[in-house]
Amino acid sequence: RRRQRQMCIRDRISRGIYKNWQVWALDLKGNELVPRWKFDTADHSSKWLAMCSHCFRVADLDGDGRDEILYGSAAIDDNGSELWCSGNGHGDILHVGKFIKDRSGLQIVASFEESKDYEGQGNGYACQVIDARDGSMITGHGRNLPVDASDVGRCIVADVDPDSPDFEYWSSTQEGMFSCNGTGLVSTTYPSGIANGVMYN
């Protein structure tokens, strides 16, 4: 039996990420792409508006054996239905993986713009570690940032500390390197890179 192949394509038109956004699932039938489902924020409550990101990730967020789509502060189930919306607003970068050894499921590390504006529906932290299953915050830093520093455009997560079983993360807030498990500040010195990392042996 031929293996089914899946592909994700992202097209950002103008600056629509700050208002309405859509995600489509398409099947290749013969030589045609046929829509399977469409998630359009116009068909959902206003809390979904402006919750997407400059990138998305595909992973089994809820542990059901099927991949979901993570798009900023919003997660869409494999069938196109709502999984969760954390209410934390728009961000630039997302990382998904197993960052806390003894915690079930996957975790997300993400940074956000204008996080203070979303304290009412989110939690106001500019960089967060999030439970991928339900969008709840595990830990975070960068709350109550001054206006000129409120756009936290980058963060990174990596296993830097050999004495800890869990990963560490840091961001462009330049506040330090923190543990993903919520135990707090690990170090005030950390690598200068805040975009992507490569793990190797």
Predicted segments, located by residue:
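Repeat-based blade/solenoid architectures
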Residues: 1, 42-55, 87-96, 143-158, ...
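Structural motif
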Residues: 18-24, 77-79, 116-128, 175-181
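Residues in Ca2+-coordinating acidic/glycine-rich loops
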Residues: 59-67, 101-104, 161-166, 182, ...
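Residue-level signature of beta-propeller blades and closely related beta-rich strand-turn architectures
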Residues: 15-17, 75, 100, 112-114, ...
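Calcium-coordinating acidic loop motifs
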Residues: 28, 60-62, 78, 99-100, ...
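Short, small-residue-biased leader/transition segments that mark boundaries at the very start
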Residues: 2-9
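A short beta-strand motif characteristic of beta-propeller blades
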Residues: 34-46, 81-86, 136-145, 184-189
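Short, solvent-exposed loop/turn segments at conserved positions within beta-propeller repeat blades
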Residues: 16-20, 49-51, 87-89, 117-125, ...
